[in-house]
């Protein structure tokens, strides 16, 4: 079943990124059929049987699970589209037993989840994981990312790529740097304090 196998990608972009792979995997695993209703939302087609993921926390989504009722579908939650109503443009999605009805407006918070980024997979586990590695993602070829992807698998892991690329990831122990204004601001503040201390020392010596 598609919910037991998860493709994990280092990035969204490129031929082996989530965007392109989701198009290809939807076409291969859940092609158009007269028995499957579908709804087009801008350039994305949501079809009965599609694997989808919530991309933002939404505390107002109502769901039912057996006789239980609740609310809230959260960033990273993965579900299967059970039905599409073309007339009302509502989509019914099963999030591991929690069944929610999405209006067409709510579809902007969904994306296909045949392939997701390794980052999005953190905290989740799957029976089988497939990780495609290409030279396009050379700036993401580091060990921690590979480790995160591999440890999502409970039973089987398949890494697709050349031995050289896999070895590059295993050997590269650096961590991704998060570039922001924090570092330069800290450097400015430290330089300012150093200047003040120097001025104080000069004043005292005078």
Label every model-predicted segment.
Residues 1-69:
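Conserved helicase/translocase motor-coupling segment
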Residues 75-206:
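C-terminal accessory regions
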């Amino acid at each position: 079943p598609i919910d037991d196998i998860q493709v994990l990608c280092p990035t969204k972009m490129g031929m082996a990124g989530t965007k392109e792979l989701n198009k290809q995997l939807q076409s291969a695993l859940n092609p158009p059929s007269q028995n499957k209703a579908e709804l087009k939302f801008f350039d994305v087609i949501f079809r009965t049987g599609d694997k989808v993921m919530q991309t933002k926390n939404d505390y107002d989504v109502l769901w039912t699970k057996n006789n239980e009722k609740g609310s809230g579908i959260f960033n990273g939650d993965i579900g299967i589209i059970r039905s599409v109503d073309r007339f009302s443009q509502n989509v019914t999605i099963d999030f591991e037993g929690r069944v929610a009805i999405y209006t067409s407006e709510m579809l902007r918070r969904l994306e296909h989840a045949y392939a997701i980024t390794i980052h999005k997979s953190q905290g989740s586990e799957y029976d089988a994981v497939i990780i495609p590695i290409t030279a396009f993602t050379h700036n993401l070829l580091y060990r921690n990312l590979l480790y995160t992807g591999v440890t999502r698998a409970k039973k089987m892991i398949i890494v697709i790529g050349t031995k050289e690329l896999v070895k590059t990831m295993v050997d590269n122990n650096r961590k991704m740097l998060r570039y922001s204004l924090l570092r330069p601001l800290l450097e400015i503040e430290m330089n300012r304090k150093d200047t003040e201390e120097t001025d104080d020392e000069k004043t005292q010596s005078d």
